UniProtKB/Swiss-Prot annotation:
Entry binding sites for glycerol: 82-83, 134, 246-247
Alphabetically ordered keywords of this record: ATP-binding, Glycerol metabolism, Kinase, Nucleotide-binding, Transferase
Gene name linked to the record: glpK
Full protein name: Glycerol kinase
Top EC class, one word: transferase
Pathway info: Polyol metabolism; glycerol degradation via glycerol kinase pathway; sn-glycerol 3-phosphate from glycerol: step 1/1
Organism this protein belongs to: Saccharopolyspora erythraea (strain ATCC 11635 / DSM 40517 / JCM 4748 / NBRC 13426 / NCIMB 8594 / NRRL 2338)
Length: 500
């Protein structure tokens, strides 16, 4: 009998496969990084074929590490970096261009053109999103407008669009030989092209963007059997039964299943999601309204989201571009060599600022520098930037929801950094709680798949599987907390109006 569920987690920097048991504990994981391609300033790309090759590799690796055979896996779920855009030929399976990554800002002029009539919130009521370079719609439009011959091919119905969930699913189920062209509402709600109420593509918006609807995948629920893996390959014949965008997957994996429950994922960027139940709350404070999940035929659950572009990737930058650390975990050790930031604040607006500012004209800045500031202070300022940005989003969330946050569930790669977690509790003034399984993104996708095939009986099983690992309570006096935050807010204003 099948005693395990697998999840493919296609992220911004790597692809991995994780295998979970019935208690939601990790049995095995295999992970491979892929190249980050930076053709110009502000441009970020991935090679979709490299990612598909890595996907097959990690599925085989995880199964081998777990010492399991395919028949012991009940189902497979997919979770993915959202918004990242792939356009490919439906007959050959070849991408017409590299994947344009969510952080990429090349579509600024398209955003400005669309915002000229109706402003940044032109599509906000229907989609829950502001016009921004972040979302897939403008990226599809850029590929259609800038890659030779692509628009004509798209209009003839020869090309397909997908985010990474769709790209992995299509290839896993046969590719040009009958591959499924499907997505779920959590991913579709990040394109700027889906109506949040109907959960369908909005033909008027697609027409205004100049995107043929024939390119777009079918939108199905987040938890159902979409199809089966092609017979060739390590997971041959297994049902693919769950799809969730990475941040919604983490929300589901964290068991934030009731209105008012929230989680913050610390990854390449930070993503704070608050469950608002079946109500679509339109933000007045720079947050996104997004689909949280739709489990089979159940009602759609919505979330408010605060997206922060640069957090974990700032640590990467410190390692790769400046060489101040040799590996990401070293930053905590370096930051502990000093007691504070020495008056230095680092605003990592590498690709503008996301929530709650939505300023694509902003660029990164280190302010407050003196001769006193050393490597340790810079390391500390890098970590503190993550916590300060999180507070900005939580204040916007409190204003929109009218419900002050009482505690924060955290997950993702950076939550192993105890200095950061303590500072996060200090700057928020509420407890920060880390679960036993901190990589909840893959777990959420596994839950969605397992529910679809009856491996788990109900969402209550998810809640009962959740367990606390550690809690950090605030220790900083309120007066100091507010003084630090005021300095941060002042630093943020110094990054505006940089790009003409």
């Amino acid at each position: 009998m099948a005693s395990y569920v697998a999840a493919i987690d296609q992220g911004t920097t790597s692809t991995r496969c994780m295998i979970f048991n019935h208690s939601g504990r990790v049995v095995a994981v295999d992970q491979v990084e892929h190249r980050q391609i930076f053709p110009r300033a502000g441009w970020v790309e991935h090679d979709p074929e490299e990612i598909w090759s890595n996907t097959r590799q990690v599925c085989a690796g995880a199964l081998a590490k777990a010492d399991l055979v395919t028949s012991e896996i009940a189902a497979v779920g997919i979770t993915n970096q959202r918004e990242t855009t792939v356009v490919w030929d439906r007959k050959t399976g070849k991408p017409v261009y590299n994947a344009i990554v969510w952080q990429d800002t090349r579509t600024d002029s398209i955003v400005n053109e669309l915002a000229a009539d109706g402003g940044q919130n032109r599509y906000h009521r229907k989609t829950g999103l502001p016009l921004a370079t972040y979302f897939s719609g403008t990226k599809i439009r850029w590929i259609l407008d800038n890659v030779d011959g692509v628009r004509a091919r798209a209009e003839k119905g020869e090309l397909l669009f997908g985010n990474m969930d769709t790209w992995v699913l299509w290839n896993s189920t046969g590719g040009p030989d009958g591959g499924l062209h499907v997505t779920d509402p959590t991913n579709a709600s990040r394109t700027l092209l889906m109506d949040l109420e109907t959960l369908d593509w909005d033909t008027d918006i697609c027409a205004e963007f100049g995107i043929p609807t024939s390119m777009l995948p079918e939108i199905r629920s987040s938890s159902e059997v979409y199809g089966h893996f092609r017979e060739r390959g390590v997971f041959g014949g297994l049902p693919i039964a769950g799809i969730l965008g990475d941040q919604q997957a983490a929300t589901f994996g964290q068991a934030c299943l009731s209105p008012g429950e929230a989680k913050n994922t610390y990854g390449t960027g930070n993503f704070l999601l608050l469950n608002t139940g079946t109500e679509r709350v339109l933000s007045e404070n720079g947050l996104l309204t997004t689909v949280g999940y739709k489990i089979g035929g159940n009602d759609t659950v919505y979330c408010l989201e605060g997206s922060i572009a640069v957090t974990g990737s700032l640590v990467q930058w410190l390692r790769d571009n400046l060489g101040l650390i040799a590996s990401a975990p070293e930053i905590e050790q370096l930051a502990r060599t000093v007691d504070d930031n020495g008056g230095a604040y680092f605003v990592p607006a590498f690709s503008g600022l996301f929530a709650p500012h939505w300023r694509s004209d902003a660029r990164g800045a280190i302010v407050g520098l003196t001769r006193f500031v050393d490597r340790g202070h810079l390391a500390r300022a890098v970590l503190e930037a993550t916590a300060f940005q999180t507070r900005e989003v939580i204040e916007a969330m409190n204003a929109d929801s009218g419900v002050p946050l009482k505690s924060l569930k955290v997950d993702g790669g950076m939550v192993g950094n105890e200095l950061l977690m303590q500072f996060q509790a200090d700057i928020l003034g509420v407890p920060v709680i880390r679960p036993v399984v901190s990589e909840t993104t893959a777990l959420g996708a596994a839950y969605a798949a397992g529910l679809a095939v009856g491996f788990w009986g109900s969402e209550e099983d998810i809640r009962s599987n959740w367990a606390k690992d550690k809690q950090w309570d605030p220790l900083m006096p309120e007066e100091k907390r507010e003084a630090e935050y005021r300095q941060w807010q002042k630093a943020v204003t110094k990054t505006f109006d940089w790009v003409e």
